[in-house]
Amino acid sequence: MELNGAKILYTIHTDIPVLGDFKITQTLVSTWIVMALLSGLAIWLGSNLKLENVSKRQAAAEFIVERLDQFVHDNMGYHFDKYIPLIGSIFALSIGCNLISVIGLWSPTADLNTEAAWAIVVFVLIMYYKIKTNGIFSYLKGLLDPIFIMAPINVLSEVSTPVSMAFRHFGNILSGTVISTLLYWALASLSHVIFGWLPGFLSQIQLFQIGIPAFTGLYFDWFGGCIQAFIFCTLTAIFIKRAAGED
């Protein structure tokens, strides 16, 4: 049994200072595949739209858009409609990256780099709205409240927002992957103990590995993945709204 991170599939050697070599990992390849699948799905759902006699495909597309609009309006208000594509993209990409493991590919969300990249985007937006709302000097002055010696703690509090978002999502997804792997290994050992005494190929029967891992995968990959995507997007909406000074 092995529990390893994403493998490096190919390395492109460069002479760029600081950045170093460009490594193509399982995370990167799986993310590209998910993005390609989501792009194809979006193009398919958004093609040949009609005002009357809409197809089931168009009805499904409209339902998704309406639910996304309602989600953003409920959590952020009507002043943040421009962030509907961002919230929707993060949600779709998160679910896609979680579910890609169902077909045997590496799940990008089991790599902290994926969640960290999303969290950095959210952090930049939070900082933008805080500075836009209060001004750069007022924002910097706020880091000194209530007394100047609290500045390091206030800075740490600002940085902890993207860190906590990234680790929350990553930890839940990775824990599901680890538990599924441990369960699969345990079931294989149990099968060997029970059927190992049989002669020939019968001793190699992995009966307990059939069916049971599918149920655990259904929870961790489908249900758990959707829940974590929902939580991440909800926190994104709330933090951006709060940074903009909206009640």
Language-model regions, residue ranges each:
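Selective transmembrane helix interface/packing segments
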Residues: 1-247
